A protein has these predicted regions:
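Helix-loop-helix
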Residues: 1-263
Length: 263
């Protein structure tokens, strides 16, 4: 075995099998609980990412001022914007770090699902290589029941339900952290990403094991809940206005005050 299999893949396979044992012999429930645990461990990074996104939204008035002042000088504009981000402590890596960390988890989870749901003799023999000999509880569990709700966790979902859940939940999660931007070019890029990413993951749901798509749905829902309690509805302005109480004073924004000219 290589380092990837020893450090990541093999532990994940055994944890999912043991989790299925204690969760009514259901790999689907094991994936859901596993997702919750992963997101709980990543909570500090996720919170930092959300707060950085919120700061970026609050900085939009100052960024717009820079665009008006240095709009024609792209080099000076980039320099001033970088200085502003440095001043406020916002880093691009802080915004994308949770996504980068989750990518190896996606790969390992996909590989784990395809192995733990083995049914053929050769597949079961290959699975036995990954089981811990000292964990006697895992051997009677194999082969696992691959069915969860309407899904066969080892195969793509041929219905439209799971792709809609994946794409819809990802769109909501991304919309909440997408800052309002008056710059036409950046606004167009944000809108393109807001549309393309959910469509891409919805398409991938038709290609990969539905167990991985189940992880995406649960992870997106957890992200939506976290974002609501940490930063509010964010870019979902329509939903935020609809649920606001009439007559309730709004919190002051962090936009700089404009003082009258001196006499």
């Amino acid at each position: 075995m290589d380092i990837w299999e020893i450090i990541i893949l093999r532990p994940m396979i055994n944890v999912l099998i043991v989790g299925s044992k204690f969760l009514f012999n259901s790999p689907g429930l094991a994936i859901i609980v596993f997702t919750i645990l992963i997101r709980a461990v990543m909570y500090p990074l996720t919170k930092k990412q959300l707060l950085s996104s919120k700061k970026m939204q609050d900085l939009q008035p100052r960024i717009q001022e820079l665009q008006k002042k240095y709009g024609k000088d792209k080099q000076r504009m980039a320099k001033e914007q970088a200085a502003l981000l440095k001043e406020t402590g916002i880093t691009n890596i802080g915004c994308i770090l949770p996504m980068l960390i989750q990518m190896p988890i996606w790969i390992a989870l996909y590989q784990s699902i395809t192995r733990i749901l083995a049914t053929g003799p050769e597949e079961l023999l290959n699975l036995s290589r990954y089981l811990y000999p000292s964990w006697h509880i895992v051997f009677p569990m194999v082969p696992l029941n691959s069915h969860f709700l309407w899904l066969n966790l080892g195969s793509p979902d041929r219905l439209v339900i799971l792709p809609i859940l994946v794409g819809g939940s990802m769109w909501i999660q991304q919309k909440m952290v997408t800052p309002t931007n008056t710059d036409p070019q950046q606004a167009a890029q944000s809108q393109m990403m807001l549309i393309m990413m959910p469509l891409l993951f919805a398409y991938m749901t038709f290609q990969f094991a539905s167990g991985l798509a189940l992880y995406w749905v649960v992870s997106n829902i957890i992200s939506i809940v976290m974002q609501y309690y940490i930063t509010g509805w964010g870019g979902l302005t329509w939903f935020s206005k609809k649920n606001s109480q009439p007559g309730k004073p709004t919190k002051p924004t962090s936009a700089p005050k404009i003082l009258p000219p001196a006499k």
